[in-house]
Amino acid sequence: MNAKNIKQTGILYIVPTPIGNLNDISYRAINILQHVDLIAAENIFHSQILLKHYNILTRTTSLNKDNEKIKSKTLIIQLKNKKNIALISNSGTPLINDPGFYLINECYNHIIKIVPIPGPCAAITALIASGLPANRFCYEGFLPSKQNSRCKILNQIKEEQRTIIFFEVTHRIIESITDIINILGPKRIITFAKELTKKWEIIQKNTSYNILIWLKQNYTYKKGEIVIIISGYNNKNTNLISDAVLKTLKILKTHLSFNKAIKITAGIYKLPKNYLYNYAINNTISKNNDIH
């Protein structure tokens, strides 16, 4: 947006809010929320906790995924009438999996000034504490709820060399980590981060397989909001099925059923059964084929 072309209008401020700890908000953000003419909130009731905490009495209106297109037209009119508006989401930085995209583009269409304010973001907070490279990364949002769609996404990023960030909901975390193991491998390093900045915050880095074991042993850790950080593809670590594994499988396969041989071999080498099974099938190692 060329500053010379901006007419005398109001300003749309994009204001991040805390992702858990109410202290994680800047003085500048509070000052803006106190002095704008209107706050466009994703959920007014939810945002009142923060606004009351800082004695922010500014009028609020709702802007969410269901009303964004209609509400944006009203907000644009107010901005044109020199009203300053702050956009906030339930937590974190607006537009990161939250409403606001349509409104921002309407501001560009109507040459209205946009001012982004730095602040909290769950994805970045998890990334910087993940112990994984943060110089190059990609953000993929929420993993799909349906397994077929989720596996399709994981296959697409299987050879992505950058660090990968996903969000996930609590009731699907076991299924999603299992899919990560089966598609990206049991030794892919991931960082599991939940309840960031809150009392029960926990950050755990390990192989995907060990994270799954840890989760199953610590059921309460599945409660809360989750960020999954996945290490990028490294072809040095992709051959997880060693010659010793294949040799063991070959010997067992001559005496046992294919499925039984898979189960025992996986147990010996602490590999997920599904991962070893899929490897065997994809490399033409089956009930009626020898191992080459």
Curated annotation (Swiss-Prot):
Stretches that traverse the bilayer: none
Keywords on record: Cytoplasm, Methyltransferase, rRNA processing, S-adenosyl-L-methionine, Transferase
GO cellular component: cytoplasm
Entry's EC annotation: 2.1.1.198
Major subcellular location class: cytoplasm
Pfam families reported for this sequence: RsmI_C, TP_methylase
GO molecular function list: rRNA (cytosine-2'-O-)-methyltransferase activity
SUPFAM superfamilies named among the record's database cross-references: Tetrapyrrole methylase
Reactions catalysed: cytidine(1402) in 16S rRNA + S-adenosyl-L-methionine = 2'-O-methylcytidine(1402) in 16S rRNA + S-adenosyl-L-homocysteine + H(+)
Localization per record: Cytoplasm
Protein task: Catalyzes the 2'-O-methylation of the ribose of cytidine 1402 (C1402) in 16S rRNA.
HAMAP family linked to this entry: 16SrRNA_methyltr_I
Family: Belongs to the methyltransferase superfamily. RsmI family.
PANTHER family xref list: RIBOSOMAL RNA SMALL SUBUNIT METHYLTRANSFERASE I
NCBIfam families associated with the record: 16S rRNA (cytidine(1402)-2'-O)-methyltransferase
Name of the protein in question: Ribosomal RNA small subunit methyltransferase I
Taxonomy of the source species: Bacteria, Pseudomonadati, Pseudomonadota, Gammaproteobacteria, Enterobacterales
Gene that specifies this protein: rsmI
